[in-house]
Amino acid sequence: MGCCGCGSCGGCGGGCGGCGGGCGGGCGGGCGGVCGSCTTCRCYRVGCCSSCCPCCRGCCGGCCSTPVICCCRRTCRSCGCGCRKGCCQQKCCCQKQCCC
């Protein structure tokens, strides 16, 4: 649950049992701890990384891509203006780059 995938192959299925198809590299820095953080896509929530880059899935629906830092907090469930579940710079925003 919430394991970090290879990115290029779309993440690991079956509870992080491994990536089939032989994708190399992928995450690069990878996720620390139990996918508590992605050094590449900067998604800060435990169990948020199903595939490291370019998007973090399962974390309030937030999408992270450098250089824009998008953080997902459970307190930000809605931005109220079209952006379903996006948090940018710890504030709810409506920019497309902050939403998945």
UniProtKB/Swiss-Prot annotation:
The keyword Lipid metabolism does not apply. Keywords: Keratin, Repeat. The keyword Repeat applies. GO terms for cellular component: intermediate filament. It comes from the Eukaryota. Residues 4-82 are annotated as: 13 X 2 AA repeats of CG. Belongs to the KRTAP type 28 family. Human have a similar number of genes as other primates despite the relative hairlessness of humans. In the hair cortex, hair keratin intermediate filaments are embedded in an interfilamentous matrix, consisting of hair keratin-associated proteins (KRTAP), which are essential for the formation of a rigid and resistant hair shaft through their extensive disulfide bond cross-linking with abundant cysteine residues of hair keratins. The matrix proteins include the high-sulfur and high-glycine-tyrosine keratins. This is Small cysteine and glycine repeat-containing protein 3. The gene is SCYGR3.
